[in-house]
Amino acid sequence: MRNSLRTLLLVLFCLVLIVGLGGGLFWGNLKFVRAVPAGVDFFGLWKPAQNLIMQGVMPYDQVNTLQVQRWVYGRAALAAEQSYQFNMPFYVILLVLPVGWIGDFAIARTLWMVALELVSVGLAGVALQLSGWRPSWFILLLAALFGLFWAPGALSILHGSLVLFQALLVFGAIRALAREADELAGAFLALGLMYISVTGLSILLIGIWVVSLRRWRVLAGFLMTLTVLGAISFLVSPSWFSDFFFSILRTWREHALPSTFTLLEGWFPGLGVQLGQAVRALAIIGLFFEWQAVRGKGTPWLFWTTGLTAVLTPYFGLRFSPVWLAFTLPAVLLVFSVMGQRWGLFGHLMAFITLAGVFIGLWVAELAVLESVFLFIYPLFMTIMLYWVRWWVTRPPRLWIDMIAQEN
């Protein structure tokens, strides 16, 4: 009887604590939302979802595009400006419908921000788990705070981007693969196809790895999830796939977002295109050899290669938003964790310096509007750092001292 009462009190205490923390988090975010007008990416999801519920307007309709443009610019977008055309699969809107029911944009955005903050913390936890490190609570807190407040993460939360959800799904799929939950991994990868320009290469890599190990249940989960989502989408909007295809084409013709090609053309007007092609060729060659090397290997090697792929994605020359670099958070934490695990006090010092350098450097670049840092310098720096720790990631610990290091 006494044990039952103690358990009941503990459960009640935990519930009160969760409700209190959740309420405080919601209230703090709501105050921030009312003071700082932003959330353009979320508005581009919320408004089509609301119009679908209230008026039956499909997400790809120009009515939605014009409403988002007027909210952003106060008018229709000019030819050189971002159009904010909805360019994701239809089922994304179905997943956003719960917040689409909320008529108050501030309340809806607040709930979305709280969800993104929790996703960011979860992503940091998944990254540390994949790195094989069991750090102290201080390190866990530091990693979570870094994920929340470094420039790409903070901006993705501020604007309401889906990229953090995408990162959690893709790297969560690798975690599921490590635990042999293959069908779940396939479902995660199917849901990770929302931002194809961000996640496409990483998902392709994981698909090649899965085929090399003949883990067909992953493909079964992937295809089953896509089939269910696609079927529901066709029931609601029979023409959604063609609308989605043409919206992608319209978006790719835009020139509002920067790319490595536009940066190099600005620096070297006569050689920019050739230099951009050379950078892309080097990225393709490097990833070709790494993708070949990871076939048949374990999930730690796959994690490292996926991090490298995410970091090098901007070098392929596609239009790329700096916010999307939040997808590379696990790569940063992988470098941080290897330094902390393998090199003792010196490693901890270098890990903190690296983390601080990335944090400060990207915020300086954001405040100074230095797009080249996000799309060129940061990927180069992270590529160097990933190769610096490659040997320790791809080779399992062989000595008892290495095993002890992973526990600390």
Regions found by a protein language model. Give the residues of each.
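Aromatic-enriched
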Residues: 335-408
